[in-house]
Design a protein with these regions (language model features):
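Internal alpha/beta loop-helix hairpins
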Residues: 1-35, 43-44
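Non-catalytic connector elements of ABC transporters
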Residues: 25, 35-132
Length: 132
């Protein structure tokens, strides 16, 4: 169990439980993207418009779209399961692509504990877009 301030737990979660406990909607955790690794990214740190420096790009289909003031909450089906995106990006149509910058990607081992995002993991994430 991680014991620290809510701000520290949000920005630097040490395990999957903490990563999903802090934040609304909770952090997306994908288990079948990179072998032996659980990949995490926060809905509000995910873009539907290419920022040009994303380390991870995932094709998806919008299931639901909910406007909450200036922000939109999307539920998106991907090859890796359903994920949530919270953004100001207002996308038309059902097909979309999710973009996540390197600084917003978290890696967790099979035991749920945080591990560093190594060069090997980054290369594996870059291959996801290529369908490798």
């Amino acid at each position: 169990m991680q014991r620290s301030t809510p701000k520290e737990m949000y920005h630097n979660p040490q395990n999957v439980y903490t990563a999903q406990f802090i934040g609304t909607p909770p952090m997306n955790i994908v288990s079948n993207m990179v072998k032996g690794i659980q990949v995490g990214f926060r809905p509000e740190k995910t873009s539907l418009i290419d920022p040009g420096d994303a380390v991870l790009s995932i094709q998806g289909r919008i299931i639901t779209k909910e406007q909450l003031g200036a922000e939109m909450n999307y539920s998106i089906e991907t090859a890796f399961g359903k994920v949530m995106v919270k953004t100001e990006d207002d996308i038309e149509g059902q097909e979309c692509r999710l973009y996540i910058r390197e600084k917003n990607v978290f890696a967790f081992g099979e035991d749920g504990n945080r591990i560093p995002v190594t060069e090997e993991i980054k290369k594996a994430l870059e291959q996801v877009e290529k369908g490798v």
